[in-house]
Amino acid sequence: MEIAKITTPKDWVYFAKGSANILFKYIGSHDFLKDKLLRIRLAKETAEYISTCELYDFVELKCKPLFADSFIDAQLIVLEQQFLAQLDSRGNKIMTSERYGLLTPNVLNGDYIRHSLSKHCQLYIGTQEPLQQVIFEIKPKWLYDNNQTNYCRTCSLNQLRDHPRHFCPLDLLYEDTINKGLSDLFSPIPDEVLSQLDREKFPVKKLFEAFLRKPDNVFLKLKCYQKTNDPSAELMQLQSSKDVSIDLSLIMTLRDVGVFIKFERYNNESGSQNPKHMGDNIVSMDEYGKFLITCNIYDLDLKSQMKFKYWQSIEVKLGPIYNSSNPNWIPCVKHSD
């Protein structure tokens, strides 16, 4: 589909950006584009650049079969240079030679109050009264059975970058650490928000626990598909970009995805915009009623083989941290297969 035939750049406003993509939100009147986001590649060095078509094929062939229930469908659309040039990218450089973009549903469509809990965890509280929806956005990063080091890879990297401790993603994987993980996850939420959730009888913590105790939840799936014999050693053994297999590229992609977990009061309209429900679960809570839990996974971007030197440089820096002792950072859970 040629997007310029049904819309103009003025119908799109800046929404967000990552390290490789920029998102625009549709504000026009065309029904087909309502509640949609336009995802466009940012400018990169040619050697590191992966085209939208390559990404689309990778996601459809490699990622979609793994996460069919929580996959956000994307449509490949044709872009024109003139259309790209007229978008307000807020100074971010777009890859103007790219002929394609991706059209995706806006998971955050609606009115929400955003609370940034940490670098990789955002909380969105719906503004509708009474409260109908709560969304967590989490980047779980590396998920694996840590049986050797004091700190997992994610917590080690957060220490390297001087981020304060929030929660360890490994705690979300095991029956005996889920409650600890959730306590840490919820700890930065402002008291007034917790009071609102309690007052509105919206048991989001209990719902999150129910989600995590399902044996097929997205975190356990990510752990399964990220599995290697030795996550760090495998990277350090690479000699050139040619040594980066498609399987390793997939694993590195899955170590950098984001997850939206949406909790909403259940009624006949819940999830009506997405009949597949994409990983939905209806959960009944005594005294609270029924809730719908929806999980969406995003940022399934194929990692360039040229990044292997960057991955190795990070591992070298993390070496002294893995088994260090930080009084401000409790050790991570150790768990054998």
Annotate each predicted stretch with a short phrase.
Residues E2-D337:
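Polybasic, positively charged surfaces/segments
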